[in-house]
Every structure is written in C-alpha cells, then in structure tokens.
C-alpha cells in the first residue's frame, strides 16, 4: 500500500497496466528469437537482458546490493545430472515507512527451450504471462513513486530462473537472499495467468488462489478484501487443497500446485505466500504455448 491512501486513487496507477503494453512485451519475450528461454542457454541471456533494459527504461533500479539487476548462480540440475550457469533478475523499489521490510513478487523467466526437432517452446503463458505482468506492475509502482507515493514497505521484483529445472532459481535466492528472509513479509508468486481453463469458459475473469491461508490468515484476508474493493475477480480456492484432482498431461492426478512453483521456497522459510494461477491447458510445455493465445484483456 502507498502512503496517504485515503486521498490517493490507486486505480490511477493500476489502470496504467494495459492489454496493449502486455501484448507488446509478450510478442517479444515469447518470440522464437528467445529460443524458449531455457536456463543456461543463449535464449536465457536474451531474456535477462530484455528484463534489465525494460526496468532501466521505466526507472526501476536493480535489486542486488551493488545496484545490479543480475544474480548469477551455478546450480545443479538434478534431472540432467549437470551444473548450469544461470541468472535471476532483481529490481527494487524502496519503501518509505518500513523500508527494511520487504514484499517479494516473483515469476519465473525461463521456459523449456527447443525440442529435438527444432520446434521452439515459446512459453507465452508459462511464464511469459507472469513475467510481463511483473514488468507492468513495476511500472505502475514507479509511476506512483514519481508522484511522491512510495509503498510503505520495499518491493522486490524477483524474476527467478531455472524453475523448469526444479525451482532452482527460487531455491538459490532463498539460500542467498539479497535481503534477509526474516524481513520478508510476504511472497506473491505469479505463474501462468494468461489463459482461461475449461472450468471457467463462462466466466474468464477468475484467478486460482493457492496457499494464501497456509501461514497467515491476514494475507488471505487482505488479498480477498483488495480483490473485492478494486477488481472483483472470481477467486477460486479449489486448488488450495493439494489433493484436489486435476486432469493434466493426459490423466487425473492430485494437483499438488502448492508444491510446484517458486513460492514454495519462501513458504519453506516461513514467509507467507500466495500463488496466482489460471490453470493448465492443452498447450502446456508445448510449442503451441504462443503469444497469440494469451488473453491480454483479462
């Protein structure tokens, strides 16, 4: 929240996030040029440089202690039995009243790369949707800062990599945090919010909320009340129970979504977290997860 919220219309800044700008970002970020953004590849380097350049354009500073945007890491990809060199991207807006307390917003910048037949997995929804949303959110925050309205707490925009290798970028950050985990009040994790699943064809303005009440009832209540006040999405909690069945990859299985995205490493450090998600679809981890299928108007 920003200072002087009783006289500030926060929707002014929220409305700066437009379908047009999201689409412009996506058609670059999820293009063939980025070669599926696999961690440890040249495509990932293109992705991290794109993010850095966009943050510099909007005036949001790097989130490393030396002011840099890149957190280099060498991580072991167990599924492939090899180490890879990869990078998280961090951008930072300092808070006003409680600058040492931190809200961390996450999405993963990587995807699964190129198939053996040369087809590119563009990863528009997974997780170009979360990545581009974060860029636009950061710009909205910075517009408020430019008007003299800093958030009460500091905000770290953390684009983690190697999520597709096993949540490795968020694990690395949790073990090597730029800001103390004990000062991190919450994590908001955004992964796959660009499509409409089969359960919501009749009401596309929805969002799955996962984990909001696991460590903090306050976080759950604030999330619900802010939704009711400003955007009025249908908040669907069915997957908050990890045992709820989902049809995925050709079969029914327990969803376990609470354990399958980058918020997990914050939760494991006792940081309350919410996972924002719109569900899976037939293009999940396929070359058909492309920018033209994203619902930018949602």
Model regions: which residues?
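Solvent-exposed loop/turn segments at secondary-structure junctions
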Residues: 33-36, 55, 61-62, 77-80, ...
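Alpha-helical metal-binding/catalytic segments enriched in His/Glu/Asp
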Residues: 89, 105-166
């Amino acid at each position: 929240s920003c200072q002087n919220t009783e006289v500030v219309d926060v929707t002014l800044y929220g409305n700066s996030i437009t379908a047009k700008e999201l689409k412009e970002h996506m058609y670059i970020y999820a293009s063939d040029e980025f070669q599926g953004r696999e961690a440890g590849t040249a495509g990932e380097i293109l992705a991290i440089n794109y993010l850095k350049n966009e943050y510099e354009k909007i005036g949001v500073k790097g989130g490393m202690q030396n002011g840099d945007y890149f957190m280099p890491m060498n991580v072991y990809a167990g599924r492939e039995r090899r180490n890879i060199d990869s990078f998280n991207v961090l951008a930072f807006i300092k808070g006003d009243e409680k600058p040492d307390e931190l809200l961390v917003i996450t999405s993963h910048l990587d995807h699964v790369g190129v198939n053996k037949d040369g087809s590119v997995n563009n990863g528009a929804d997974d997780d170009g949707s979360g990545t581009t949303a974060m860029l636009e959110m950061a710009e909205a925050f910075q517009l408020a800062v430019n008007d003299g309205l800093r958030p009460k707490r500091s905000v770290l925009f953390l684009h983690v990599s190697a999520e597709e290798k096993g949540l490795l970028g968020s694990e690395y950050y949790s073990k090597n945090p730029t800001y103390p985990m004990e000062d991190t009040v919450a994590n908001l994790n955004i992964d796959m919010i660009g499509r409409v699943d089969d359960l919501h064809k009749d009401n596309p303005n929805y969002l799955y909320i996962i984990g909001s009440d696991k460590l903090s009832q306050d976080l759950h209540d604030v999330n619900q009340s802010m939704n009711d006040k400003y955007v009025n999405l249908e908040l669907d909690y069915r997957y908050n129970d990890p045992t709820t069945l989902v049809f995925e990859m050709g079969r029914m299985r327990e969803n376990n979504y609470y354990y399958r995205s980058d918020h997990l490493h914050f939760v494991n450090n006792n940081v309350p977290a919410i996972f924002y998600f719109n569900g899976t679809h037939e293009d999940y981890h396929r070359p058909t997860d492309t920018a033209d299928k994203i619902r930018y108007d949602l």
